[in-house]
Amino acid sequence: TPWHKRTLMKMAPTREAHDRLVFWLLLLAGSVLYLSFGYTEMAGSDMWWHIAAGRELVQTGTIWMVDDWSYTESGSDWLNHEWLSDLIYYGWVSLWGVETLVYWKWLVVISSFLLLQLALSRTSGNDFAGFVCAGIAIAIAAPFIDVRPHLYTLLNFSLLLYLLLGRQPKLWLLIPLFVVWVNLHGGFFFGLMALAILLFPWRELSFKTVQAAALVGIACLVAAMLNPSGFGTFLYPLKYAFDETSP
């Protein structure tokens, strides 16, 4: 009836406002939750090493480094695949002091899991489900949240999910992501593995869709080669994983 139609039309804006309020409240709740998990040990086992490596980069003025710290490998080429992270650490500490790295950690952690929450909320169509699943994810990750470059992999992985879950791939976003990621942390390798799964046309399998996905994947693979060691950076995680003398 006309009366029912008018009633439904009046209720629609109210429902929309309610959903928007719930969305923002869950983001706020998520921020507080993720901040609380950031109250862990600040100094990672190699935090000082990364700060010193950043200082070395600034002092030498080159990203192609030589190992002058160790005894057995002194003078050898140094594959510092996390050079950009080291520069960020050293720059941050030089500007604001080492104590403020805790704020850097909170910024990266909150951003990482808010992006994950947003990606999951959008994909599931349920804001509360996105909040709960992101909360479970950070609870699992909590023992590993300290000041080390691996936090950038958490951030970039969440960004990758946000860009690709339920969306068409955009090369102008994915290529810069992998160029930056490969120079921040070796976890880019897992990002490329996840990229293959996210790009594969599971529901619309055809030569054309597979070809399109492959072209995007190849472009991101080439982008990841834009680092000081080129393809050597791809071999480093494999060498580290299968070398029985690695810690």
Briefly describe each language-model feature range.
Residues 1-35:
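Start-transfer (signal-anchor) and selected internal transmembrane alpha helices
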Residues 23, 28, 116-140:
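Transmembrane-helix signature of polytopic, membrane-embedded enzymes
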Residues 34, 137-141, 162-163, 172-186, ...:
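Membrane-interface alpha helices of multi-pass inner-membrane proteins
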Residues 58, 189-247:
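Transmembrane catalytic cores of multi-pass membrane glycosyltransferases
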Residues 72-99, 103, 107:
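Short hydrophobic/aromatic helix or loop-helix immediately within or flanking a transmembrane segment
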Residues 103-123:
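Transmembrane-helix motifs of polytopic, lipid-linked glycan transferases
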Residues 144-151:
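Short acidic/glycine- and proline-prone juxtamembrane loop motifs at membrane-interface regions
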Residues 157-172, 203:
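Membrane-interface transmembrane helices that cradle and orient dolichyl/undecaprenyl
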